[in-house]
Amino acid sequence: MEKRNTYDWVTRWVIASFSILTISYMITWTSISNAYPIFAQKSYESPREATGRIVCANCHLAKKSVEIEVPQSVLPNSVFEAIVKIPYDTQIKQVLANGKKGGLNVGAVLILPEGFELAPSDRISPEIKQKIGNLNFQNYSPSQKNILVIGPIPGQKYREIVFPILSPDPATKKEVNFRKYPIYVGGNRGRGQVYPDGSKSNNTVYNASATGRVSQILRKDKGGYEVTIENISQGRSVVDIIPPGPELLVSEGDFVKVDQPLTNNPNVGGFGQVNAEIVLQDPFRIQGLLVFLASVVLAQIFLVLKKKQFEKVQLAEMNF
């Protein structure tokens, strides 16, 4: 009988532990997926609008800087680095989905010209592989190999993201030409303020939905508040729900106006985008340039020799 009770207890413990782990995983996954390229991939056919704006800015409302470094020109069918830099102060903490504070994650989208794509592993040099680390890049969609996304990844470790890029060869891809091409990049640090469905995250400011007096502030067991605002002139009251994370700025008895902030703005991150240019260089043009430069150098050498020969002749005539 004692053995059976022990078995039942162990069974219940295993089931309870599994349930807790499952819930924790779902919360963590929700926290991660609610902020980064997965939303753009699901909601937008292209990450760049006709106006030139990258769609990540629709959810990450604060503007921050981002940088990109690419070679001025590349040869066809060659691997090069596109380095995206997402600078921020690593000492700051952001509000997580559960209302607690934690480090910032980063994400990036790299929009390359048609024909450019992520370099296959066997074409990447050991030096570039070391810079990449354990990063896992994705195509924006199966048909858009020239658009790469990554994130969320720890910003503490990856404020610089190295994309290994393979340039196209016009000899095999007729739609590609030797010319200058634009590159677009967007990068964010921290979570977004708005979800694609228009709802707010807990990483933004919450405003009063009505004008009136704050009659009650109820602190919820799992964090957050219910703020009751009484509008005496209209004889009604509204309840504004504030999730865990933002800090409350009002107290009971305060008079507030519609759209007045009830909380601070906890967001410490933001999104930025920048453009760059790269030239797909024709190797025969480079060879022609080298031949031209060599001919110029040789011409200069011959001129110097001819000048010295002429000076010797003049000197000999003067001595004669």
From Swiss-Prot:
What residue range is the signal peptide?
1-35
GO:BP terms for this protein?
photosynthesis
Please list every transmembrane segment annotated in the UniProt record, as residue ranges.
286-306
Q: Does the keyword Protease apply?
A: no
Q: How is the cofactor bound?
A: Binds 1 heme group covalently.
Supply the alphabetized keyword list: Chloroplast, Electron transport, Heme, Iron, Membrane, Metal-binding, Photosynthesis, Plastid, Signal, Thylakoid, Transmembrane, Transmembrane helix, Transport
Molecular function as annotated in GO: electron transfer activity; heme binding; iron ion binding
Where is this chain's protein located in or outside the cell? Plastid, Chloroplast thylakoid membrane
InterPro entries attached here? Cyt-f_TM, Cyt_f, Cyt_f_lg_dom, Cyt_f_lg_dom_sf, Rudment_hybrid_motif
Q: How does it assemble?
A: The 4 large subunits of the cytochrome b6-f complex are cytochrome b6, subunit IV (17 kDa polypeptide, petD), cytochrome f and the Rieske protein, while the 4 small subunits are PetG, PetL, PetM and PetN. The complex functions as a dimer.
Please report which protein family the annotation says this sequence is part of.
Answer: Belongs to the cytochrome f family.
Write down what this protein is called.
Answer: Cytochrome f
Q: Which source organism does the UniProt entry give?
A: Welwitschia mirabilis (Tree tumbo)
Q: What is the lineage of its organism?
A: Eukaryota, Viridiplantae, Streptophyta, Embryophyta, Tracheophyta
